[in-house]
Structure formats: C-alpha cells, structure tokens
C-alpha cells in the first residue's frame, strides 16, 4: 500500500511534466512548429473539428507552416478559424493551401516569452511539491494507523523526495530547452 502511494505520486508527477510540455509547446518560439495549431478548432459541417483532423500541417521552411486541407471546400472555414485564433499570425490562402509565416521575434518579446516559460515551470514545480506533500501526508497517516513502521516511513519519505527531485530536475531541463529555443536567433 505504501509503495502504491509513491508509485501514484510518480505517475502524477509525470502527468505534470506532460502538461508542462503541452503548455510550452503552445508558446511560439520564432520558428514553425505544428503544435502551435493543436488548439485550433474549425466549424466543419456544423460541428467543431480539430484542425489537425481536417488538414495536413507541414513545415516547408523554418518559419512557415503550411495547412493542406483534405477537403478543399473547408479551406475558407480553416482560414476563418485561423484568423479568429489568438495566434497573431495572418494566414495566406492561395486557393489550395494556407501558409502561416511565423514573424521573427524581437529581443524584448523573447525576454517576455522566457519569463512566461519560467512562470509555467514554476507552476509545475509547485504542483510537484503539492503531490509530494499529499503523498507524505498519506504515508504519515499509515504510520500513525500502524500500517507501516517508523523506519519504513523514513525510507519511503526518502523515496518520495528522490522522486520529487527527479521530477523537478526534468522540469528544469524542459524549461531550459524551451528557453534556449526561444533565445536562439
């Protein structure tokens, strides 16, 4: 039972890391990345449909995203959805495909985005610490109820701390990689 608490904490920490990667994937870093369009939904035959299910998204050049709809009749709807999104990128429709040119980031904007990355990573670290605290509380309750010994509690606390340190290190690595991507010109 006590090891299950540690295992569940590790799973939850992994989910926090995945969530951070998703959040950071949505941040524009001055180069084309298909994940920028993951959140876009298009009104298609009266139903909201994710863009990546309606079109092939390719990167023909480092700063260009190309959206090639599977159904050419949906081109106008896709363009409308891209214009309505908060990407801040104007789509260019040539009748067959839509091209999105990612603008070059200014030095000031790069600093703002790097701060944003820092905020996301700090939120993830807080979530990791909360997971650790909840796990430790459960372990202490088990020790109090007599389910585990005091020695087991200390060993499990060390295991929980190691899992927390590992997760925090991975979050720092993820954030550092994104900051490096942002600051590269």
Curated annotation (Swiss-Prot):
Q: Any idea where this protein resides?
A: Cytoplasm
PANTHER family hit by this protein: MITOCHONDRIAL RIBOSOME RECYCLING FACTOR PSEUDO 1, RIBOSOME RECYCLING FACTOR
The uppermost taxa in this organism's lineage are:
Bacteria, Bacillati, Bacillota, Bacilli, Lactobacillales
Q: Which UniProt keywords apply?
A: Cytoplasm, Protein biosynthesis
Q: Which NCBIfam families match?
A: frr
**What is the top-level taxon of the source organism?**
Bacteria
Role of this protein: Responsible for the release of ribosomes from messenger RNA at the termination of protein biosynthesis. May increase the efficiency of translation by recycling ribosomes from one round of translation to another.
Q: Name one Pfam family in it.
A: RRF
Q: Which GO terms describe its biological process?
A: translational termination
Is DNA-binding tagged as a keyword? no
Tell me which InterPro entries the record gives. Ribosome_recyc_fac, Ribosome_recyc_fac_dom, RRF_sf
Name one cellular component (GO) term: cytoplasm
Give the family, as the similarity comment puts it: Belongs to the RRF family.
Q: What is this protein called?
A: Ribosome-recycling factor
Q: Which GO terms describe its molecular function?
A: ribosomal large subunit binding
Q: Which Gene3D superfamilies match?
A: 3.30.1360.40, Ribosome-recycling factor (1.10.132.20)
